[in-house]
């Protein structure tokens, strides 16, 4: 089996990948993550996932490189990482009582052959109606400023959800393991 490399510095993705009990290393790619004019949210996350994997190919020949990227979509608007309390507060106020779809782009690049599998896995959450007090309590407790849409689903963020719909709950955290296992199997990698 070619060595696995996770093209990410995300602790959340690292924890998810470790669930497969396969040895892997991590390396953070340096790419421009800007949204291109006219680019759909699906095209954006697929492109960024592949670019993250390809950015490490020359320095990691003969590896299986996993790239992933996620955005949240509210209506027609892409909402990314808020980075600040005020932006997170506004994102959650906007999402109150609405449906938010998380799109997670996933790429598995065989840097030996150049073959790359790319997909996008959606996961929808229906938000509870949230007031400012609840939002601020959540933000102070969780500080989800590095999470798309200000939702930290692996923590208290799940308390903001009324219901969820999707084929792979791990995609909500940023690495869709069910789809990744399919891709790994296509490369001849069996999970324990």
UniProtKB/Swiss-Prot annotation:
Keywords, comma-separated and alphabetical: Cytoplasm, Hydrolase, Nucleotide metabolism
Keyword field contains Magnesium: no
GO BP, sorted A to Z: nucleotide metabolic process
EC number of this enzyme: 3.6.1.-
InterPro entries xref list: ITPase-like_fam, Maf-like
Site (Important for substrate specificity): 12, 70, 154
Transit peptide found in the keyword field: no
Superkingdom of this protein's organism: Bacteria
Subcellular location: Cytoplasm
Required co-factors: a divalent metal cation
Group of enzyme by EC: hydrolase
Catalytically driven reaction(s): N(7)-methyl-GTP + H2O = N(7)-methyl-GMP + diphosphate + H(+)
GO molecular function per UniProt: nucleoside triphosphate diphosphatase activity
One GO location term (cellular component): cytoplasm
Active site: 69 (proton acceptor)
Similarity field: Belongs to the Maf family. YceF subfamily.
Function: Nucleoside triphosphate pyrophosphatase that hydrolyzes 7-methyl-GTP (m(7)GTP). May have a dual role in cell division arrest and in preventing the incorporation of modified nucleotides into cellular nucleic acids.
Entry protein name: 7-methyl-GTP pyrophosphatase
Species in which this protein is naturally found: Pseudomonas fluorescens (strain ATCC BAA-477 / NRRL B-23932 / Pf-5)
């Amino acid at each position: 089996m070619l060595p696995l490399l996770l093209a990410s510095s995300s602790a959340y993705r690292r924890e998810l990948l470790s669930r497969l009990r396969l040895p892997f290393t991590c390396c953070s790619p340096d790419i421009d993550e800007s949204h291109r004019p006219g680019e759909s949210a699906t095209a954006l996350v697929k492109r960024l996932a592949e670019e993250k994997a390809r950015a490490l190919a020359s320095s990691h020949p003969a590896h299986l490189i996993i790239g992933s990227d996620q955005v949240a979509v509210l209506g027609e608007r892409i909402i990314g990482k808020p980075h600040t309390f005020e932006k997170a507060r506004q994102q959650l106020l906007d999402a109150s009582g609405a449906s938010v779809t998380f799109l997670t782009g996933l790429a598995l690049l065989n840097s030996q052959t150049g073959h790359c599998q790319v997909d996008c896995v959606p996961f929808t959450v229906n938000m509870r109606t949230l007031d400012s007090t609840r939002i601020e309590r959540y933000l102070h407790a969780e500080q989800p400023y590095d999470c798309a849409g200000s939702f930290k689903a692996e923590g208290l963020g799940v308390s903001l959800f009324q219901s969820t719909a999707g084929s792979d709950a791990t995609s909500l955290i940023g690495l869709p393991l069910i789809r990744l296992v399919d891709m790994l199997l296509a490369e001849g990698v069996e999970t324990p």
